[in-house]
Design a protein with these regions (language model features):
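Active-site anion/phosphate-binding pocket segments in diverse small-molecule metabolic enzymes
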Residues: 2-172
Length: 172
């Protein structure tokens, strides 16, 4: 208001993004940049009725049994503690799987990110398969020991549309 009182024309005034749109009425001014709110991928409350958009779908490349003691992965190899049935998901971080936008860098934010990565899952039909180890560059290993699936079955996983590469974009 002081700027307008001094005789300056500002045009549309906006200095807020998605978080302010959802949580801070005073920061909205004349408009907001609601990029991540449109994707449902911003800090939000449980009752905001937004839906997260963006998922990838690919067929499983291979399914096989691996013996106890077998090593899986390259970046941080995991030694299997028991005979495990694994599936190869032909998607990795180069495709955007497991890639997230940096948020906070506090200890608790990083700890929360680490816990989420330990629990990352993929849907195969109506079943959930947990990722074994870390997401690879071009492939990711899944534990499908107790699941009914085979090579060629469609796997669906959460992916941020801003980082998705190597996929046909389809809006449903």
């Amino acid at each position: 208001d002081a700027i307008h009182a001094a005789g300056f024309e500002t045009g549309v005034v906006h200095a807020a993004g998605s978080f302010a749109l959802l949580h801070n009425d005073g920061a909205r001014l004349d408009g907001v940049r609601a990029g991540s709110a449109i994707l449902g991928r911003c800090r939000r409350t449980r009752d905001d009725r937004l839906r997260t958009v963006g998922c990838g779908e690919v067929p499983l490349a291979e399914v096989r049994w691996l013996p106890k003691g077998h090593t899986v992965g390259t970046d941080k190899p995991v030694v299997l503690k028991k005979t495990t049935r694994v599936a190869v998901l032909p998607v990795g971080y180069q495709n955007g799987f497991g890639v997230t936008r940096p948020r906070e860098t506090s200890f608790w934010a990083l700890w929360s990110l680490w816990r989420r990565n330990k629990k990352r899952t993929v849907r195969i039909g109506d079943q959930r398969a947990r990722v074994i180890g870390s997401v690879g560059a071009t492939e990711t290993m899944l534990n499908v020991t107790n699941l009914k699936c085979s090579a060629g079955d469609l796997a669906t996983f959460d992916i941020d549309p801003l980082f998705a590469r190597g996929f046909t974009r389809e809006f449903r």
